[in-house]
């Protein structure tokens, strides 16, 4: 009963910022569909996030297909109803749209479909839902849903097509959602956006993907007007007093395919090569090998850490692993893949590469550096006795 709704909203995610990823991935799916239907041309799709700290308000709006008025209640109002396909769509469980209920007083969905002169609105009393969830009463899921949802319509310009999610009166304990700097930093590695054009090695990534016949999905996403990019750079920095200074750089990229015994590509990756001076400090937000499905990051920068010979190995590198196989299915928290045979093969292949190639790269670099350091110390002592 009501426990299902609790699990799908307040109990689903440990990091409140995940709501942005959920709503953005839904918007990206609809942008893809809008391009397929000819509503948008490639490159015309946008997702705009607006946040007002004083009003504790957030809006996430796309210019994609929108939802037809006749389909609105069934598509948006039916819990976990989803017509999306595993392996094709970025979001496929249909539960992501509920995540905002945990973090605000009122959650509102507004949409209009091209050619229709009406906009459909669903308003959810999120505060009431949370109160009913903790009451000592045996509410059914339907009891709660019927009590918190209202539908309405209004006139709209037939030329308009969009879907908007609005969150009113963000909870005091979820103020992080209104921290524009933190949200932009979070989104820059999680959502499917382009590399920043100052990352000069990006052309090699696109060229390699093209050679494989793999399309890296990228969308224009803005936060209060600022476009979000993946914040990769060739410079590796370290703290030096109050400032940051460059201590190493990524000189080139190495690429690796991962294929099963039938020769089918299940994943591929790029990794940045440097002098491997040391473990990359935390001030480099891009550090670590990240795993991506449909160009959306799964988990954090440590998702693949357990596949290294030693945990610290992950942070000697910068790079991305792109899942290709449709059988690599993100779990409901989107922090890794569901367990299945393909995941076992994926992990075996990565573990072998991480052990045989990457571990040796930084281990040998460390050994040579330490040998050189010992040599310099010895020479210094020799010169003292001259």
Q: Model segments located where?
A:
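P-loop NTPase nucleotide-binding/switch module
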Residues: 1-3, 7
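Interdomain "switch/hinge" adjacent to the Bergerat
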Residues: 21, 34-90, 115-287, 297, ...
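Conserved ATP-binding N-box helix of the HATPase_c
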Residues: 11-49, 96-102
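Glycine-rich phosphate-binding loop
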Residues: 85-104
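Charged regulatory segments coupled to nucleotide-binding catalytic modules in large multidomain enzymes
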Residues: 241-386
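Alpha-helical oligomerization interfaces and scaffolds
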Residues: 10, 47-48, 54-61, 165, ...
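Generic recognition of stable, solvent-exposed alpha-helical segments in well-folded globular domains
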Residues: 3, 18, 22, 67, ...
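Glycine-rich ATP-binding loops of the HATPase_c
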Residues: 106-110
């Amino acid at each position: 009963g009501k426990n299902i709704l609790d699990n799908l909203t307040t109990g689903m995610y440990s990091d409140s910022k995940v709501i942005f990823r959920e709503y953005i991935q839904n918007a990206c799916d609809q942008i893809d569909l809008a391009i397929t239907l000819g509503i948008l041309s490639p490159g015309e799709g946008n997702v705009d996030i607006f946040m007002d700290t004083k009003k504790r308000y957030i809006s996430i709006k796309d210019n994609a297909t929108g939802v037809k008025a006749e389909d609105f209640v069934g598509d948006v109002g039916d819990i976990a109803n989803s017509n999306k396909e595993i392996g094709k769509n970025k979001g496929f469980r249909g539960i992501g749209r509920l995540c905002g209920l945990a973090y605000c007083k009122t959650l509102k969905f507004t949409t209009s479909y091209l050619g229709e002169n009406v906009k459909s609105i669903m308003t959810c009393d999120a505060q009431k839902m949370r109160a009913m969830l903790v009451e000592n009463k045996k509410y059914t899921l339907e009891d709660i849903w019927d009590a918190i949802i209202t539908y309405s319509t209004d006139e709209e310009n037939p030329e308009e097509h969009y879907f908007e999610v609005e969150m009113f009166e963000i909870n005091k304990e979820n103020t992080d959602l209104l921290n524009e700097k933190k949200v932009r930093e979070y989104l820059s590695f999680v959502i499917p956006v382009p590399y920043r054009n100052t990352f000069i090695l990006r052309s090699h990534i696109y060229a390699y993907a093209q050679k494989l016949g793999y399309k890296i999905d990228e969308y224009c996403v803005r936060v209060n007007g600022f476009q979000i990019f993946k914040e990769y750079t060739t410079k590796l920095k370290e703290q030096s007093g109050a400032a940051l200074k460059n201590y190493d750089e990524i000189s080139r990229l190495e690429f690796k395919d991962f294929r099963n015994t039938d020769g089918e590509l299940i994943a591929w990756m790029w990794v940045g090569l440097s002098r491997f001076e040391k473990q990359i400090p935390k001030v480099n937000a891009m550090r670590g090998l990240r795993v991506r499905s449909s160009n959306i990051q799964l988990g954090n920068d440590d998702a693949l850490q357990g596949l290294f010979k030693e945990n610290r190995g992950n942070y000697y590198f910068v790079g991305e692993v792109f899942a290709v196989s449709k059988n690599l299915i993100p779990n409901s928290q989107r922090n890794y893949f569901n367990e299945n045979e393909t995941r076992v093969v994926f992990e075996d292949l990565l573990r072998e590469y991480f052990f045989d190639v990457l571990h040796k790269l930084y281990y040998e670099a460390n050994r040579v550096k330490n040998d050189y350091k010992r040599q310099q110390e010895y020479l210094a002592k020799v010169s003292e006795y001259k």
